[in-house]
Amino acid sequence: MHLIKLDKGSLKIDDKIEVNVNKEKRERTEAHHSATHLVHAALKRVLGDHVKQKGSLVDEHKLRFDFSHDESLSDKEISKIEDLVNQEILKNSAVSTKIMDLEDAKNSGAESLFGEKYEDQVRVLSIGEDDFSLELCGGTHISRTGDLGIFIITSQSSVASGIRRIEALSGP
């Protein structure tokens, strides 16, 4: 979220402004955003390829991830998901992006959001060893998985028929 505070006057196109970024808030939000990509990949590995992202929310306090799945997650499944994400975090692998043609990105196996419209050139995000997570994403991210700290799922719920939600934390 970007907030603008005007001390006086108004803004118009081509005006110069001073930008102040809350570094701590941005870094925590980046960490939770990056963690959502690891969560998505872990969910697919534990529950199956039918899992698709249906929504997410990231901020400096937590992450929320909505996904397609018909049943409540068992304690064993939650534990497996947490373990997979934390294994990638402990590897301290590089997080990288590259610009690719949309078709090349899809052919490489990069996940895209169903119904989302993309330009001909897209940004592909790779997280973890052997592209543990490979998705189209234009957001900001951490540099290495180790920057995430410990990951834990704090809750799960149903938000609609066939749509599950998990909330989680990542950090030191």
Feature locations, PLM:
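A glycine- and charged-residue-rich anion-binding loop/surface
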Residues: 1-172
